[in-house]
Design a protein with these regions (language model features):
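Flexible glycine-/small-residue-enriched beta->alpha junction loops
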Residues: 120-152
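A non-catalytic alpha/beta surface segment that caps or lines the substrate-entry region
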Residues: 19-65
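N-terminal glycine-rich anion-binding loops that anchor highly charged ligand groups
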Residues: 12-19, 37, 69-72
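Catalytic-core environment of secreted peptidases
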Residues: 44, 48, 60-93, 98
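N-terminal capping segment at the start of a domain
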Residues: 1-31
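Alpha-helical metal-binding/catalytic segments enriched in His/Glu/Asp
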Residues: 76, 85-124
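Conserved small/polar residues in nucleotide/adenosyl-binding loops
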Residues: 154-156
Length: 156
């Protein structure tokens, strides 16, 4: 794997999903562009041999099971939602870098001793609902569902 080329290609593809005429990105939580981007990341996870799954709010987890200590997990990632006309590296670079690092480690060393997970959080920006870190709050169990009035928008 050519790391630099892989990162560029993944960023280029993600940047095409939700791109706007001004050169920025608009991928609001649960929008069609956000969902398309999450599914692209899910496909990339599966392509490198990860088990990929969404939780109930749309956080996406890709996992490679550890060979010796599978219950111990090293997790890395970020988010792919944006504000209106957001930057092309904000959030998604962390997801792409994490995915590429796990791929590189697996190709070079094989199955890890500890489990590795890449996460693409459902939301960080707070651009869709009057709350921030919706994905993270759900992940750690401190979310207040009253902050998000219309949970029926969730269709992963």
């Amino acid at each position: 794997m050519e790391v630099e080329q892989t990162v560029k290609e993944r960023l280029q593809k993600l940047s095409s999903i939700g791109s706007d005429p001004t050169g920025g990105l608009t991928r609001l939580l649960y929008s069609d562009s956000w969902l398309s981007a999450q599914h692209y990341v899910q496909d990339q996870m599966k392509n490198i041999g990860m088990k990929a799954a969404f939780d109930e709010v749309g956080n996406l987890f890709g996992r490679i099971e550890g060979s010796e200590l599978p219950e111990e997990t090293i997790m890395t990632g970020s988010h792919i939602d944006t504000v209106v006309n957001g930057g092309k590296l904000d959030g998604q670079f962390g997801v792409v870098a994490s995915l590429t690092a796990v791929q590189m480690l697996q190709e070079k060393y094989g199955q890890p001793k500890r489990s590795l997970e890449v996460i693409s959080m459902a939301e960080e920006e707070g651009s869709r609902f009057p709350t921030v870190f919706w994905g993270s709050k759900n992940f750690v169990g401190i979310a207040n569902n009253d902050e998000v009035k219309d949970l029926s928008l969730i269709h992963i």
